[in-house]
Amino acid sequence: IFGAPLRTAGVVDVLLAFVERIAKTSRSMSLGVLILHAVFFTITGAYYVSYPVVGGMVKDLYPEYHLDRKNLMRTMLDTGTGLAPMVSWSTTGSYTTTTLGVSNLAFAPFAPMLWLSIVFSVIYAVTGIGTAKAKED
């Protein structure tokens, strides 16, 4: 529902231009996609929108930076998993709020696996540890 209007309004192009502007190395590309997906997921609150839209936007850029595309999915899964319960308008956020009876951010300190996935994703992006390189054809 949100993907097409965001593409039509040019939001997707602006976000992609941001990533292309900051991405000078494979590490900055990974970090840029992490930020891009976090922003896009927070706007839409839906995996089924953010994964195909962000993935479709940047999948062709990864080989240019000698990155295997599996890194793209790992980055999006890390940010999506970590943010989903924190975004109150997402399905996961609504569920956790209703089930636990507390605000989304109130349980964050008690769920380190959520935000640690993002922390480790940033560490992997910055250091290059665990980052698969694209195979030469």
Predicted segments, located by residue:
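Short helix-coil transition sites and intra-membrane helix breaks within transmembrane domains
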Residues: 3-13, 41-53, 83-90
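Hydrophobic alpha-helical transmembrane segments of multi-pass integral membrane proteins
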Residues: 19-57
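Alpha-helical membrane-inserting segments
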Residues: 2, 6, 40, 120-124, ...
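Alpha-helical transmembrane segments of multi-pass membrane proteins
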Residues: 28-41, 65-86, 110-118
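Re-entrant/interfacial helical elements at transmembrane boundaries that shape
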Residues: 14-17, 48-62, 90-101
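Juxtamembrane and boundary regions of transmembrane helices in multi-pass small-molecule transporters
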Residues: 93-137
